[in-house]
């Protein structure tokens, strides 16, 4: 049994292992970053650290949504990088039996660009288990790793002494 954070996007429930989650909080907005990919909603400060926010609706090819009182960011860490995921809501942590995970049908994994790696049936609910490294572009060529890796060293030589 592993703990998972359950979150929703456009009425569909997804799950992410708790081990990848640092914290969850209400999302009130982010500072926009010029030139960032469309799925990067901007940056926020979390515990004194500037963190990029990925709008999972846009990343998954869904239409963007307005902010509501339920909108959350799930602050995650993968391969030493901290990233916040904007979701419609996140209110539940569940114990899921890993033995009951089923591979995502090909049509789902292809349509979801590999972001979903398994499905978990929980009573009459189906939870789509997300692949965080895939979302963060760690397993395919993507602009996001470069954005996350930039520590400001490129800009420093341009700053006046």
Language-model features: locations:
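An acidic, low-aromatic, low-complexity terminal/linker signal
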Residues: 1-161
């Amino acid at each position: 049994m592993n703990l998972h954070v359950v979150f929703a996007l456009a009425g569909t429930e997804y799950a992410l292992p708790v081990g990848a989650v640092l914290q969850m909080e209400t999302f009130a907005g982010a500072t926009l970053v010029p030139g960032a990919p469309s799925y990067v909603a901007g940056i926020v400060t979390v515990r004194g650290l500037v963190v990029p926010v990925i709008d999972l609706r846009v990343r998954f090819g869904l239409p963007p949504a307005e902010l509501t009182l339920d909108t959350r960011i799930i602050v995650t860490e993968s391969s030493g990088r901290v990233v916040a995921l904007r979701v419609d809501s996140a209110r539940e942590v569940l114990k899921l039996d890993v033995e009951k995970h089923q591979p995502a049908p090909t049509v789902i994994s292809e349509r979801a660009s590999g972001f979903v790696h398994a499905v978990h049936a929980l009573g009459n609910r189906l939870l789509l288990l997300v692949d965080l490294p895939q979302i963060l572009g760690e397993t395919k060529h993507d602009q996001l790793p470069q954005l996350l890796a930039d520590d400001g060293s490129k800009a420093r030589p341009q700053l006046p002494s």
